[in-house]
Amino acid sequence: MTKSELIENLASTNPNVPLKDIENAVKDILEQLSQALENGERIEIRGFGSFSLHFRQSRIGRNPKTGEKVDLSAKYVPHFKAGKELKERVNIYS
């Protein structure tokens, strides 16, 4: 699902809320999440999951086209860990 599809789904399930308000709410939520991660904070949404940063050490990688070795610098990457309730909903058919 894309951000546009999310906004459309929310608009169809909430016909009394103006589309512009829904767009702004989604954008504001995503901006708040991004800012929190940018500041090194952990975000926890109970029942859904948590977002945090994981540190990746520098390493030597390879260019997939040429096979040439490439130095990859150390960096932080966003990480999502699904919560118990989300895991259960996703695995309802297993």
UniProtKB/Swiss-Prot annotation:
Entry GO CC: chromosome; cytosol
Any GO MF annotation of the entry: DNA binding
Keyword DNA-binding: yes
UniProt-listed SUPFAM superfamilies: IHF-like DNA-binding proteins (SSF47729)
Cleavable signal peptide: none
Annotated InterPro entries: Hist_DNA-bd, Histone-like_DNA-bd_CS, IHF-like_DNA-bd_dom_sf, IHF_beta
CDD domains: IHF_B
Function recorded in the entry: This protein is one of the two subunits of integration host factor, a specific DNA-binding protein that functions in genetic recombination as well as in transcriptional and translational control.
Subunit structure and binding partners: Heterodimer of an alpha and a beta chain.
Name of the molecule in the record: Integration host factor subunit beta
Source organism: Histophilus somni (strain 2336)
Gene, per the UniProt record: ihfB
